[in-house]
Amino acid sequence: MDQWLETKQLPVHFVSAAGVVYQDGKVLLIRSERRGWEFPGGIVEQGEALLDGLRSEIFEESGIAAEPEAVAGIYQNLARKKGFGPLEGMTLPTTVNLVFRCRYVSGKEVVSEEFLEVGWFTPDEAMRIIRYPYMKKAFEDAHRYSGKPHFVTFRKADRDIAFISDCMI
């Protein structure tokens, strides 16, 4: 249980934040070459406040300023996976991702260097075009948010995904 005390190696997890941003009934999505359509977000930098990291990721990836309104879900990926791009050759730690429902504040869509497209879609369109299983599940949970966030545990390596548990907290 406290194995890290014996080995003197502190546990390491990535903490990330993502935002399902709504404006006039539409949802903001970005498209990457690797995962297709998804909502903006990313790893929170060490020493950075979670909500500041969320706002920053949304703006950097889309040009849109957004304000978080509620935590829609907490998603824990138990898989340690191989890095890609600049992280190739590394084994990445497990990830805990907080997904927020957000409202549009200002800005115009801008495609960043990391992504191919940015756009606004109806929720039905978003459900059709989001292909990445974890993103699809998180979007579905955020869109159907009823005041209680989902807590989902899964194991994802490459394209395979196994959902282990899903409960409302």
Q: PLM ranges: what are they?
A:
Residues 65-74:
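A short coil-to-beta-strand element that immediately follows conserved catalytic motifs
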Residues 37, 113-169:
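Nudix hydrolase/Nudix homology domain
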